[in-house]
Amino acid sequence: MLTQFSRTELLLGKEAMDRLKNARVAVFVIGGVGGYVCEALVRTGVGAFDLIDDDKVCLTNLNRQIIATRKTVGKYKTEVMKERMLEINPDVKVEIHDCFFLPENAKDFPFEEYDYIVDAVDTVTAKIALVMKAKEMNIPIISSMGAGNKLDASKFEVADIYKTSVCPLAKVMRRELKKRGVKKLKVVYSKEEPIKPVEDMAISCRSNCICPPGAKHKCTERRAIPGSVAFVPSVVGLIIAGEVVKDLVKDC
């Protein structure tokens, strides 16, 4: 009998599909990268998710985020993503956490139940804390490096953090993880030199914030406004999703 996953099963096989159905993946931050991770994984057959993000959909998200439409502006990203995932697969299990991950609230997450962690966070402190928690719990993790201020999606690749170059975020992560004794970390990063945003536009975006009421990360509070396009973070998210699937089923 045909199912919505029949064509995927042609490639992966039944054992792998069963593995994915029984897997629980935590995606930290449901933005330009994380949204496409969720989209690809639910369409591939992953059976359970934890979505972690304290932000709401903003009008400026419409240029790149899969959950962003005129109708979803002002809604929590986790709730919008959950609704979309259930429309794709009504049997998927989705837990949402409308909060931002930090070391002090790590105890609030069921890490012991996660089979894989996706780090799509864009702040160094939270990224490092998440990586350290994953290493402590021996949970596979993949981290997204900088996807903003870039135009060439073909420059992204999968590598160990200590094999990366060019990316400013990866440079900081290498330094901080080395201090903490982390030996390896799978990441997706780009060798493209970051493009400097048009200065007067960045100032305008920050000073004329149109974020929804109650938004936790308003433009007026950001040190820098990164430029973005639809065809870059989406590719990063799809690359990450592919790595998650391949890792989960590699011994099937």
Residues covered by each model-derived region:
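N-terminal charged helix/coil linker that caps or initiates catalytic domains
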Residues: 1-26
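Conserved N-terminal Rossmann-fold NAD(P)-binding element of oxidoreductases
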Residues: 27-29, 52
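Glycine-rich phosphate-binding loop and adjoining beta1-alpha1-beta2 segment
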Residues: 46, 51-89
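Short gly/pro/ser/thr-enriched loop/turn and capping motifs at secondary-structure boundaries
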Residues: 57-60, 148-153
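Conserved SAM/SAH-binding loop
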Residues: 98-106
